[in-house]
Amino acid sequence: MAKKSWIARDKKKAETVKRYAELRAQLKAEKDYIGLTMLPRNASPTRTVNRCLVSGRRRAFIRRFKLSRISFRELANAGMIPGVTKSSW
């Protein structure tokens, strides 16, 4: 599992992105790039990281389920994810 401090840091970044989203859109529409550079770095949506809801892992993230591959496999094998079955042909 990821460290709680990393998970908290990413949540804080996501909150910063939400706070400045409207202002960023306005500055982009006005093409005020100097104004954009004056905003905090964490206000950019590209700095947010997708994390697994179960383990907090950031690598091998499956967007559709918001889980890492490891958590997805464990939950799918246990039958905890509706509609997911093991493939066989």
UniProtKB/Swiss-Prot annotation:
GO terms for cellular component: cytoplasm; small ribosomal subunit. One of its GO terms (molecular function) is rRNA binding. Keywords: Ribonucleoprotein, Ribosomal protein, RNA-binding, rRNA-binding. GO terms for biological process: translation. Disulfide bonds: none annotated. It holds the Pfam family Ribosomal_S14. Part of the 30S ribosomal subunit. Contacts proteins S3 and S10. HAMAP family: Ribosomal_uS14_1. Belongs to the universal ribosomal protein uS14 family. Binds 16S rRNA, required for the assembly of 30S particles and may also be responsible for determining the conformation of the 16S rRNA at the A site. This is Small ribosomal subunit protein uS14. The lineage of its organism: Bacteria, Pseudomonadati, Verrucomicrobiota, Verrucomicrobiia, Verrucomicrobiales.
